[in-house]
């Protein structure tokens, strides 16, 4: 039975529970790492446990006609670069020390991977030279293999290349903070205005938007609609007013209303021209902005770095916002902007939702490029979608084996709020190699399960035992949801398996230890014990156990958590 496809190791349920400060403690995360995830213990995700578990998962997962899939299709930004870098240090397997000779071929692979990612050629040359010099001069470190040494060097250089430290937005000490957005046409400036306001509202700041794009049809209407969507007022003055005058009037209105942050949208062009720059200079003169941010499309590659340089020379900018980082392009812009222009990337857009704008963390980005995941971002996203009280209640239900369909539905919807499944898995160490086909299948099966749960009565959701004991109830749910009785039986059986698996994993994490792989596999195969009580209760428990075992033996659809 493979009913629950949104799962990890051997169909471990993806259940989310946040406890403590910036901490995830749940079966969802432990299934991938073998223990509790927190910001300190998993700052480095290429640990032995993760690699062992991922190797085991790959050995269990069959894709296609009985064949093991050798390569994965990477659809996210940097996917091509990640694959190229992994190929580079795989050639150091078996080496005992890094030498000029044995790193020559890996360095060629790194150079090729960076160029194919559309990183600027001068940047690639400096990067490769720096990595080579450090690798050859590094002595043998006890317990660390040469390929791991190279990974560490490349990681540190990537962090340095992208700016090193996080560059945060600056705020005015008195009066409203003014942020001026600029950029070429079609990069998403108007949308970024609303996303930035949404981002700042979460920090407790009041915002106002100024519609300064008087050339593009419906640009003002678009900003007004987006402003209503995020709950932020928009100042408009029509299309017959000069942008500089709009800026002056809008700023006056913001001061009158004691607004904390003013964000102004400006017109874009298909190319950089003198008229555009002069107009921006006038707007900047009237606004005297705290931040001048250039909005750059991540898909423009190394041209993005040249664009940032040009705007900085002409009008003077304080940083860049990189949009469409969730696309499938090569992503060289993120690696080139800081090095070429000297200006940092301050924020990045990762999706179409208003919440999909976040700070740019060079160290986290380097980790994702190298396939290490991004545990800290995972923790932050999880804490955003789940309250502390809900997490504690869920943990109690898991430990008492009372996890029900209501909890399952709540958890899957909470995970959905964190973003696409591809994005969530990309944050988890070792899970970046799950293929898009497997993810699509998992998402499809989640919808199937949700449809079946939706037609259950409140009592059936709270007491899965009723469905396990009543074929008539299962038949009714199958009919009402448009699914088969086999699918309903598989889902009901899965909830009992989930109770045992999550309780075992939570118990392991409470003990603070990471079990050996064999121990983890044993925990996943644990059977539910019949509850003590009267003979009648024991017979019902035995009946449910037989139902679970019989349903589990039936084949179901494959997903990335399939053990078939």
UniProtKB/Swiss-Prot annotation:
Pfam families in the record: SRP54, SRP54_N, SRP_SPB
Binding site for GTP: 183-190, 265-269, 323-326
Location in or out of the cell: Plastid, Chloroplast stroma
Keyword tags: Chloroplast, GTP-binding, Hydrolase, Nucleotide-binding, Plastid, Ribonucleoprotein, RNA-binding, Signal recognition particle, Transit peptide
GO BP terms, alphabetized: protein heterotrimerization; SRP-dependent cotranslational protein targeting to membrane
Known catalytic reactions: GTP + H2O = GDP + phosphate + H(+)
A GO MF label: GTP binding
PROSITE patterns, per database record: SRP54
Superkingdom, taxonomy of origin: Eukaryota
Entry EC number(s): 3.6.5.4
Region (M-domain): 371-564
Tissues/organs with expression: Most abundant in green shoot tissue and lower levels seen in the roots and etiolated buds.
Main location as per UniProt: plastid
Effect of residue 538 to M: No effect on binding to CAO/cpSRP43
A GO-annotated cellular component: plasma membrane
Presequence range in chain numbering: 1-75
Keyword ATP-binding belongs to the record: no
UniProt-annotated stretches for the region G-domain: 76-370
The protein's assembly and partners: Component of the cpSRP complex, composed of a FFC/cpSRP54 monomer and a CAO/cpSRP43 dimer. Interacts (via C-terminus) with CAO/cpSRP43 and with CPFTSY. Interacts with the third transmembrane domain of LHCP. Interacts with the PSBA/D1 nascent chain, but only when it is attached to the 70S ribosome and if it is shorter than 189 amino acid residues.
Similarity-based family: Belongs to the GTP-binding SRP family. SRP54 subfamily.
Other noteworthy facts: Unlike eukaryotic or prokaryotic signal recognition particle (SRP), the chloroplast SRP from higher plants lacks an SRP-RNA component. It targets both chloroplast-encoded and nucleus-encoded substrates to the thylakoid membrane, post-translationally for the nucleus-encoded proteins and co-translationally for the chloroplast-encoded proteins.
Role noted for this protein: Involved in cotranslational and post-translational sorting of thylakoid proteins. Binds GTP specifically. Activates the GTPase activity of CPFTSY when bound together. Required for light-harvesting chlorophyll a/b-binding protein (LHCP) integration into thylakoids.
PANTHER family attached to this UniProt entry: SIGNAL RECOGNITION PARTICLE 54K PROTEIN SRP54 (PTHR11564), SIGNAL RECOGNITION PARTICLE SUBUNIT SRP54 (PTHR11564:SF5)
Name of the featured protein: Signal recognition particle subunit SRP54, chloroplastic
Gene source species: Arabidopsis thaliana (Mouse-ear cress)
